[in-house]
Amino acid sequence: AVPLTSYALTFDARGGYRSGSHAYETRLKVSNGWENGWWGSLETDSWNGVHNNSNEVIGLSYNELETNYTIKLDDKWSLKPGMLTHWSKAGTRFGPYLKLSYDVNPDLNLGIRYRYDYNVYRSTDLDGNNARANQHRWDGYVTYRINDLFTAAWQTTVYTYQNDFHYNNHKKWATENAFVLLYKMSKNITPYIEYDYLDRQGAYNGRDNISENSYRVGVSFNL
């Protein structure tokens, strides 16, 4: 999903539904940014069900801690090294990343990010061996402030397994595309809607390789 970034303490509540997997999601997130460049967040995400592929843990309920630091290169370019720590019933995953951001103008921002997801735990691969389902992940970002009230964002993602695993689309790689529209209702309240196309990664009643759409509604509060 597209991150909602601010330089104040923020509480974000979001609900979602995946049409292919027939799964409902609830996420609660607290984040804070500091003027010295540091940013951090803590979130918990719960599902009413999980995917049926034992090697695909994306549908598990989880908790996530993230932190990053912005390095200003000049008035338009910035680097953002960060670390994501993700834990669920399956185990713990670390995701170090580096993001490059460019402000085209005050209303338009572009970004690219590389993240390496390292699983502390092991899973059963396609050959029946115990291995780590580590991933390479590339993200692209476009954020555009339409006017004082509306902001639109697009995030595109490609990720690949490092080892001998497949996603629910029966491939070693998969894609995601997320589109978000935010409405600044007031200084402290910003509701938003989000649509994601998650490739053919749906799984339901023992079937996978199902076209997956995600529909989300949320609201962000500056505290």
Q: What positions do the PLM features span?
A:
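Residues that define the transmembrane beta-barrel architecture of outer-membrane proteins
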Residues: 22-26, 30, 59-65, 92-96, ...
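Detector for outer-membrane/organellar transmembrane beta-barrel domains
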Residues: 74-80, 91-165
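Short glycine/proline- and aromatic-enriched beta-strand/turn motifs that initiate or cap beta-hairpins
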Residues: 5-55, 60-62
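Outer-membrane beta-barrel domain signature
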Residues: 15-21, 27, 52-58, 84-89, ...
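Repeated loop/turn-to-beta-strand initiation elements of outer-membrane beta-barrel proteins
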Residues: 9-11, 36-42, 72-81, 106-112, ...
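Transmembrane beta-strands of outer-membrane beta-barrel pores
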Residues: 15-21, 44-50, 71, 83-89, ...
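Outer-membrane beta-barrel "beta-signal"
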Residues: 144, 179, 183-184, 209-223
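Outer membrane beta-barrel transmembrane domains
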Residues: 153-186, 190-198, 204-206
